[in-house]
Amino acid sequence: LLLSDECPYTIKMAIYPDNTKKEFLDTKETSISSVLEQLEEAFRYIKLNNKVKAKIVGINRIEVPEYNEEVIRECLLNTIGHRNYEIPGSTLIHIFKDSIEFLSLGGLVSGLTIDDIKIGSSSSRNPKLISILHRLGYVEAYGSGIPRIMETYKLSKEKPEIIVAPNSFLIKIPKLDLDIDTLTIKNLLVTNNTITREDIERTLGIQKTSALKILNKMVEDGVLLKEDKGKSTTYKLNN
């Protein structure tokens, strides 16, 4: 039934102008179709409402969305992959001014805690569905979704919030509160263990003073570690 074109377990979404549910700007419910089609439909709707910040560096345009698209997809996969389909009702997604909430029916599988899933422990009430999602490439590794979401916010002051009740599971993701420069430096450190001031100057197209200001602020905030090596100073993520 879940993979048929007549799956009745829809996803209902609403957009709000602020951080309350007093009034909404728009609503949408996915069509009665397979959970995979509903996943893609919901993703497209959220993506349309995911604002993008942009910066021009030389001839390049750097774009940073308010919400990481991989995080959105992981949250959607979690809602359809682990919900309790014995409980009738729709998955709910609330798009607020500063956050998005994904609320699915069914609490944690017996024996698991929030701390367990944050470090990657996995147990599903829908093993066949998860297996299909894995074979189709939607799920890369069992139990990796929540840890990947948390890792994305490693440099952010605001962190995702998980609330579990006996019959529901909510994950709330905040807007990424990092500026474009900080996000660019973070992405640079994904492929490089260390960086130098000169790397930042070239990547961001800025002068020495501006590069040092950004790096020093990230060191003060505890995001980066500064390592003096004689004439060379390098920076790395503070794990």
Residue ranges with predicted function:
Residues 1-239:
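C-terminal regulatory or interaction extensions
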